[in-house]
Regions:
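Short, low-complexity disordered leader/linker segments with a strong preference
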Residues: 1-55, 430-447
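Immediate post-signal peptide segment of exported/extracytoplasmic ligand-binding proteins
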Residues: 38-58, 89-94, 187-193, 364
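Beta-alpha junction/loop-to-helix N-cap segments that form part of ligand/metal-binding clefts
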Residues: 40-44, 68-75, 87-161, 171, ...
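Extracytoplasmic "Venus flytrap"
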Residues: 40-78, 100-107, 129-130, 198-206, ...
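Extracellular/periplasmic Venus flytrap/periplasmic-binding protein
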Residues: 107-111, 155-157, 164-268, 318
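Periplasmic-binding protein-like
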Residues: 116-129, 147-151, 195-199, 244-254, ...
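Extracellular/periplasmic periplasmic-binding protein-like sensory domains
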Residues: 264-348, 440-441
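Segments of small-molecule ligand-sensing domains
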Residues: 333-344, 355-414
Length: 447
């Protein structure tokens, strides 16, 4: 696969966020690191690691506008870690998973990340969620040399330039590559569509738009953007309707899928919708529609029938998939109750990859060794993801592709096979690799 890295198109954290991090660091500097828990520097940094435990941190919106769905991701990771711990841990070490609420607010993300690094002294961060939120802390984590693994966001910032962020790794398919795959499908299957874009006003939306324009630039007739936190998207949807967009592509979080659908209903606007995997879970969006409409919308999941989307993981409704079967068993034995959802599946999948990296690193675990493992071996890691990881010394981007899917009767149906690509001018090709199957016990083997 040809790969072109991108330079000069970065979405940098504003100086104000850097100042907040500095203030937080100074405030907590007195906590220091416990020298007794670390080996000499020459042996590598073992902060957060003892003979019996590995301390791992994460930030998620457990409250606030982005909490629906996203707040359950760490429950999936916790269930998987509990299962691994119950089976002896990783080289005898149990994983101590510490999750803090940032309410999808970058200022709060800065504060709680400082706590995790300087007070809790975590070994690594895993799955910290959000593009605007993680942009506020990525420089701090890298300057502190804390492994920042599997960021829960498809921003290219997490992996397109390892020299700038050597300690950070993406996980899911990046938004630019997703935009390319969506754009190519539209160009091939709906070449006469008048395309409107509904975008989150940050790197999430901007990267998606860049990928789309590689294939359907001339088809795009309108672009509407929203700022996270607001609840009225009437002007944005009305603008798309005014331009007679008959296909709307949304790079947005689930709450705004529901809000855009409610506004479209009020305006009697009925385009074909194509939401990214981020905002297309029918069960969650259906519940949000009922909530936001104060019960006026019933069976909201049915409103998404016919909606196009993408997928880089199997859907929980696919009960014949061996990964779904394995994770469902683990969820039933170690989860926090209720049926397994796609969000808990996401967290379990990240936790599986992290355990895979720990196993591949070996018993002598250091921060430096973990990063080296991901760069040298991560490209060969397998798991529930459909496409290979792109991990190497030159790229810290996550999985390399996805399927185009369609929602029918609350189920996710494949429209294409696995399409793989990369950022920049890399071509889109159909993957020839077969999907992997999980180990019998659901735990990656030690090397």
């Amino acid at each position: 696969m040809t790969r072109t890295t991108r330079r000069g198109h970065r979405f940098r954290r504003p100086a104000g966020a850097a100042a907040l991090l500095l203030v937080g660091a100074l405030a907590l500097a007195g906590c220091g690191r416990d020298a007794s828990s670390r080996e000499p520097a020459a042996a590598g940094d073992t902060t957060g690691v003892t003979d019996t435990s590995i301390k791992v941190g994460a930030t998620f919106p457990l409250t606030g506008v982005a909490a629906p769905g996203y707040s359950t991701i760490p429950k999936g990771a916790q269930a998987y870690f509990d299962y691994v711990n119950d089976n002896g841990g990783v080289y005898g070490r149990k994983i101590d998973y510490i999750v803090k609420d940032d309410a999808y607010n970058p200022t709060t993300t800065s504060s709680v990340t400082n706590e995790l690094v300087l007070k809790d002294q975590v070994f690594a961060m895993l799955g910290a969620l959000g593009t605007p939120t993680h942009e506020a802390v990525v420089d701090f984590l890298n300057s502190s040399k804390v492994p920042d693994i599997a960021v829960s966001s498809g921003s290219v910032t997490w992996g397109d330039d390892p020299k700038e962020h050597p300690w950070t790794f993406g996980w899911q398919t990046d938004y630019e590559s997703e935009g390319k795959i969506i754009g190519k499908w539209i160009a091939d299957n709906m070449p006469k569509a008048r395309v409107g874009l509904f975008l989150q006003n940050d790197d999430f939306g901007a990267s998606g738009e860049k990928g789309l324009r590689d294939y359907i630039d001339k088809q795009i007739v309108a672009v509407s953007k929203y700022t996270p936190g607001g609840t009225d998207v009437t002007p944005q949807i009305a603008a798309l309707q005014a331009k007679k967009a008959d296909l709307v592509v949304g790079f947005n979080v689930p709450s705004y899928t529901a809000l855009s659908q409610l506004v479209a209903m009020k305006l009697n606007y009925k385009p074909q919708w194509f939401y990214t995997n981020v905002g297309s879970d029918p069960t969650l969006v259906g519940s949000l529609l009922a909530n936001f409409s104060k019960g006026q919308v019933k069976n909201g999941a049915q409103l998404l029938d016919g909606v196009m989307s993408t997928a880089y993981l199997p859907d929980v409704s696919n009960t014949s998939n061996p990964w779904i079967q394995t994770f469902d068993k683990i969820w039933k034995s170690n989860g926090s109750g209720g049926a397994l959802t796609n969000y808990e599946l996401y967290g379990m999948s990240q936790a599986y990859m992290f355990v895979q990296a720990l196993q591949a690193t070996g018993k002598d675990l250091t921060r430096e060794a973990l990063v080296k493992t991901l760069e040298e071996k991560g490209g060969d890691f397998t798991g529930p993801v459909f496409a290979p990881y792109r991990y190497s010394a030159d790229s810290h981007l996550g999985t390399s592709g996805m399927k185009v899917v369609k929602i029918e009767g609350g189920q996710v149906k494949d429209v294409t096979g696995v399409e793989t690509t990369d950022i920049g001018d890399a071509d889109i090709t159909e993957s020839s690799e077969s999907e992997s199957t999980p180990p019998a016990d659901g735990i990656p083997p030690a090397e």
